[in-house]
C-alpha cells in the first residue's frame, strides 16, 4: 500500500508501481482523504477537522486493503504526508500492515500520555519561534504557519502565475536542480537558525507561497532539460 505526500496524488507512484508489480506484489496507491476527487469532507477553512484525525486516515488505509480482498499487506509505504499516516497504520494494526517504510518525513514517535492532569492540568503553550521569526530584521514566517492561515488555500489556487507555473516553481525550488539548495543541520529550533532555511520553508513574512516560489521559476531552457519532473510526464 503506497500513501502519497503533499501536494500530490496517487499518480506520484506511477513509476514505482510497475516495478513492485513485476516483483509479484499487488500494489495499491489511493488518493488519501482530502486529496484529488475524494469526498465526504469539507474544504472550507471553518470546516470540521475531525474527519482528518489520524485514526480516520488509518481506517481509510484499512478500508482500501479490505476492499481489494486482502486481510493484510506486506508493507505500507508513506512519503511526506503519507509518512505520517503509514507508521500509525503499522502501530495501530500490525496484523494488517506487516512492515512500514517511511520516506522524506521522519516519524517522531507516539506522544506521551498526559499524567496527573487532575492535580496539574496541562496548559496550552505557544511556540515563541513564530513571534521571534516575525521580529527578525528581515521578518519571516514558517511555511506551516502560513498554510494554517485562512488565505493560504486561495493564494495557491489563485496564484497570479497560474497553478501550473506555481507548482513548477514550487517543485523546482525544493529539488536538487535548484543550485542554492545546500542541506546541512541546524544548531537549534531558533528564529536565527530557521532563517537560514530556503524560503519555501521559512518565508518572508509578507509574501504568499506563490510569490515566494515565483522568484525561483526556472527558465524555459531549464524546464526543457528537466528529467525529474518534465511537463510531458
Residue ranges and their predicted role:
Residues 35-77, 83-233:
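Flexible "cap/lid" subdomain of the alpha/beta-hydrolase fold that forms the substrate-access gate
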Amino acid at each position: 500500500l503506497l500513501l502519497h505526500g503533499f501536494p500530490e496524488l496517487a499518480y506520484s507512484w506511477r513509476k514505482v508501481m510497475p516495478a513492485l508489480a513485476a516483483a509479484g506484489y499487488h500494489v495499491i496507491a489511493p488518493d488519501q482523504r482530502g486529496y484529488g476527487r475524494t469526498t465526504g469532507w469539507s474544504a472550507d477553512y471553518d470546516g470540521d477537522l475531525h474527519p482528518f484525525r489520524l485514526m480516520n486516515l488509518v481506517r481509510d488505509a484499512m478500508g482500501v486493503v479490505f476492499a481489494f480482498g486482502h486481510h493484510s499487506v506486506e508493507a505500507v509505504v508513506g512519503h511526506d504526508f503519507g509518512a505520517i499516516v503509514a507508521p500509525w497504520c503499522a502501530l495501530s494494526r500490525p496484523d494488517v500492515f506487516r512492515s512500514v517504510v517511511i520516506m522524506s518525513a521522519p516519524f517522531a514517535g507516539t506522544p506521551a500520555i498526559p499524567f496527573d492532569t487532575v492535580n496539574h492540568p496541562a496548559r496550552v503553550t505557544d511556540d515563541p519561534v513564530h513571534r521571534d521569526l516575525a521580529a527578525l530584521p528581515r521578518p519571516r514566517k514558517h511555511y506551516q504557519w502560513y498554510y494554517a492561515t485562512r488565505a493560504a488555500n486561495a493564494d495557491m489556487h489563485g496564484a497570479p502565475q497560474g497553478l501550473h507555473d506555481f507548482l513548477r516553481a514550487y517543485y523546482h525550488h525544493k529539488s536538487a536542480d535548484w543550485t542554492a539548495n545546500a542541506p546541512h543541520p541546524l544548531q537549534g529550533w531558533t528564529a536565527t537558525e530557521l532563517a537560514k532555511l530556503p524560503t519555501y520553508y521559512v518565508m518572508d513574512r509578507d509574501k504568499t507561497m506563490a510569490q515566494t516560489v515565483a522568484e525561483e521559476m526556472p527558465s524555459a531552457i531549464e524546464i526543457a532539460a528537466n528529467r525529474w519532473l518534465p511537463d510531458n510526464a
